[in-house]
Amino acid sequence: MNKQVEIFTDGSCLGNPGPGGYGIVMRYKQVEKTLARGYRLTTNNRMEMLAAVMALQALKEPCRVILTTDSQYVRQGITQWIHNWKLRGWKTADKKPVKNADLWQALDKETARHQVEWRWVKGHAGHRENEMCDELARQAAENPTEDDIGYQPEPQ
């Protein structure tokens, strides 16, 4: 695991649920690459998570990764909550199914391939790469092309 890659991610949702998208900025040495995709019906949290999953999946080999997100949900979920969810068979402390378990499991699998340091940055605070990701995610949400097959509407 020699290569160190910086990854910045953001998710956006126009309405929650509604059309959504993710934006990713990846940097290796001085080279930056961006990724984005829009979904017809999803949530903001799913887009935040999917951004991290897709960014890590895009790495062709195990790397040392500094992943910066403006989502406390993603950062706390993957660094703190996930351990007990796995012990409980993907149930919360009150025995309910973990929301977005499909993406938590995918993120868990991807983080196992890499050495990931999770960082949080305040959104909409002028952080260059976060602002780039936000714009990519918003543009993707405005032009959705995919179905979020894992999205499950809340029971009414």
Swiss-Prot record:
Mg(2+) 1 binds at D10, E48, D70. Binds 1 Mg(2+) ion per subunit. May bind a second metal ion at a regulatory site, or after substrate binding. The keyword Nucleus does not apply. Residues 135-156 are annotated as: Disordered. GO terms for biological process: DNA replication, removal of RNA primer. It is found in: Cytoplasm. Residues 1-142 form the RNase H type-1 domain. It comes from the Bacteria. Keywords: Cytoplasm, Endonuclease, Hydrolase, Magnesium, Metal-binding, Nuclease. One of its GO terms (molecular function) is nucleic acid binding. It catalyses: Endonucleolytic cleavage to 5'-phosphomonoester. It holds the Pfam family RNase_H. One of its GO terms (cellular component) is cytoplasm. Mg(2+) 2 binds at D10, D134. Monomer. Belongs to the RNase H family. This is Ribonuclease HI. It comes from Vibrio cholerae serotype O1 (strain ATCC 39315 / El Tor Inaba N16961).
